[in-house]
From Swiss-Prot:
EC number: 2.7.11.1
Binding site for ATP: 23-31, 46
Reaction(s) the record says it catalyses: L-seryl-[protein] + ATP = O-phospho-L-seryl-[protein] + ADP + H(+); L-threonyl-[protein] + ATP = O-phospho-L-threonyl-[protein] + ADP + H(+)
Protein name: Casein kinase I isoform alpha-like
Length: 337
């Protein structure tokens, strides 16, 4: 196996987590596949140079500590320093929803969108009950689990999360304006564009844009061109504000427009009615006569690919028997995410 992870491969962190290869990277640094030397368990290892201007891994590790035990929150194995790096060792998860969207040719059925929506709302609700906002809701930050957790959705990347109320007094942070936009501009709420301090309503509105991204395959404010990043953000903001919810959701069940209108109508400190939002989509799911069987679009594709691989493998064996020659076959055209 070729190794593209440079000098970090074979490094052991936390006394028992051996780095195998690089599997991703972000603004903070790199993510490696690691193996636990004591039991052979695979883990994900995030490395951040201690020289970075704005370190965020320590903060993120504190967030994971607070959130531990929640459904769909990855387990944190270890945090510490190793060879000039801050290191966070987590459960190894499966592909992100962005990966799976691409795998499914950027088309999700309504059944898949609704099954995902149910879990996504619950993940954000849990983070909010722990007094934090996520502030970077996007398909890349929702990952499916692996093995027996392959149908469970996990929420990751709490580097931009912010405490919105005090644990003891339950005092909410004050309303402010002139704030810089935090998060991913494509899914940012209108109030975030306007420079208003984010609160629970903004996470929920961002989620509504993710739903419509999956439904439509793209959002009307994608692909806008501008000379500078600032001008691009302004164009996106203008397009988002000038696109009525009914236009954004045209051609899709009314529940999606109801969801977005509800979120946009929330007051700064107001608690979203998470159960009402889940029920919107659960009732729609039943109305459309879907079965909640965790058969997602990618489940079907992978099953089909596995069947094709098995059948081509069988044909290969037949050909080998007939000709006495080994026939090299492509066993599977799907990456095991």
């Amino acid at each position: 196996m070729t190794n593209n992870s440079g000098s970090k491969a074979e490094l052991v962190v936390g006394g028992k987590y051996k780095l195998v290869r690089k599997i991703g990277s972000g603004s903070f640094g790199d993510v490696y596949l690691g193996i636990t030397t004591t039991n052979g368990e695979d883990v994900a290892v995030k490395l951040e140079s201690q020289k970075v201007k704005h370190p965020q891994l320590l903060y993120e590790s504190k967030l994971y500590t607070i959130l531990q035990g929640g459904v769909g929150i990855p387990h944190m194995h270890w945090y510490g320093q190793e060879k000039d790096n801050n290191v966070l060792v987590m459960d190894l998860l499966g592909p992100s929803l962005e990966d799976l969207f691409n795998f499914c040719s950027r088309r999700f059925t309504m059944k898949t969108v609704l099954m995902l929506a149910d879990q996504m709302i619950s993940r954000i609700e849990y983070v909010h009950t722990k007094n934090f906002l996520h502030r970077d809701i996007k398909p890349d930050n929702f990952l499916m689990g692996t093995g027996r957790h392959c149908n469970k959705l996990f929420l990751i990347d709490f580097g931009l999360a912010k405490k919105y109320r005090d644990n003891r007094t339950r005092q909410h942070i004050p309303y402010r304006e002139d704030k810089h936009l935090i998060g991913t501009v494509r899914y940012a709420s209108i109030n975030a564009h306007l420079g208003i301090e984010q609160s629970r309503r903004d996470d929920m509105e961002s989620l509504g844009y993710v739903f419509m991204y999956f439904n439509r395959t793209s959002l009307p404010w994608q692909g806008l061109r501008a000379m500078t990043k600032k001008q691009k953000y302004e164009k996106i903001s203008e397009k988002k504000m000038s696109t009525p919810v009914e236009v954004l959701c045209k051609g899709f069940p009314a529940e999606f427009a109801m969801y977005l209108n509800y979120c946009r109508g929330l007051r700064f400190e107001e608690v979203p009615d998470y159960m009402y939002l889940r029920q919107l989509f659960r009732i729609l799911f039943r109305t459309l006569n879907h079965q909640y069987d965790y058969t997602f679009d990618w489940t079907m594709l992978k099953q089909k690919a596995a069947q094709q691989a098995a059948s081509s493998s069988g044909q290969g064996q037949q050909a080998q028997t007939q000709t006495g020659k080994q026939t090299e076959k492509n066993k599977n055209n799907v990456k095991d995410n």
